[in-house]
Swiss-Prot record:
One of its GO terms (cellular component) is mitochondrial inner membrane. InterPro entries: CcO_II, CcO_II-like_C, Copper_CuA, Cupredoxin, Cyt_c_oxidase_su2_TM_sf. It catalyses: 4 Fe(II)-[cytochrome c] + O2 + 8 H(+)(in) = 4 Fe(III)-[cytochrome c] + 2 H2O + 4 H(+)(out). This is Cytochrome c oxidase subunit 2. One of its GO terms (biological process) is ATP synthesis coupled electron transport. Component of the cytochrome c oxidase, the last enzyme in the mitochondrial electron transport chain which drives oxidative phosphorylation. The respiratory chain contains 3 multisubunit complexes succinate dehydrogenase (complex II, CII), ubiquinol-cytochrome c oxidoreductase (cytochrome b-c1 complex, complex III, CIII) and cytochrome c oxidase (complex IV, CIV), that cooperate to transfer electrons derived from NADH and succinate to molecular oxygen, creating an electrochemical gradient over the inner membrane that drives transmembrane transport and the ATP synthase. GO terms for molecular function: copper ion binding; cytochrome-c oxidase activity. Residues 37-63 are mitochondrial matrix.
Length: 210
């Protein structure tokens, strides 16, 4: 429930920011059009005008306030996005990911332990993706919010799944946390994207959402 409310709040905030930005953009062009029209009519009709556009305090104040309002709107959106990105949503379950040289270990539901290694060349089947197939796949439920704790034991790794927009470093002695959520059933592939040794390119990640 909190995830849905947060999603709609961010969506509404983005819509408001876009509307405000468009309104300010439109107002600036309307003001520029009015000023250009006034100057053109004044020049054509030879009307003597004493307006001082160079040192007008009113115009300086107007543009300063307009710019500050625009910047404050952008800062408000940024602060809200940073705040909601750090909130611990109500998650279904916890999944721990530990990086080793050169394989992954997943801990699910507090008891299940999955060792995920690259399969041997002789075990490939027709249609398998080379260097992206594991002997054990991490199976999760779609439309369910998961909290992932990511760490490493020996060297720095990087848990990366481009399809989900996930890239988090696995640092020994440090636990990084990310939220994982998928809307469709799919099998997603990833790899370690941090140079972690000789077999760095042989640490595939496979997550199957059902």
């Amino acid at each position: 429930m909190s995830f849905i409310l947060t999603f709609w709040m961010i969506f509404l905030m983005d819509s408001i920011i876009v509307l405000i930005s468009f309104s300010i953009f439109l107002s600036v062009w309307i003001c520029a059009l009015i000023i250009a029209t006034v100057l053109t009519v004044t020049k054509i009709n030879n009307i003597y005008c004493t307006w001082d556009f160079i040192s007008s305090k009113f115009i300086d104040t107007y543009w300063f306030v307009l710019g500050m309002m625009f910047i404050l709107c952008l800062l408000l959106r940024l602060c809200l996005l940073l705040y909601f990105s750090c909130i611990n949503f109500v998650s279904f379950d916890l999944c721990k990911v530990i990086g080793f040289q050169w394989y992954w270990v997943y801990f699910l539901f507090g008891e299940t332990t999955i060792f995920s290694n690259l399969i041997l060349e002789s075990d490939y089947l027709i249609g398998d993706l080379r260097i992206l197939q594991c002997n054990h796949v991490l199976t999760l439920l779609s439309l369910v919010i998961y909290k992932l704790w990511v760490s490493a034991v020996d060297v720095i790794h990087s848990f990366t799944i481009s399809s989900l927009g996930i890239k988090v470093d696995c640092i020994p002695g440090r636990c990084n946390e990310i939220i994982l959520f998928a809307t469709n059933n799919a099998t997603l592939y990833g790899q370690c994207s941090e140079l972690c040794g000789v077999l760095h390119g042989f640490m595939p990640i496979v997550i199957n959402f059902i």
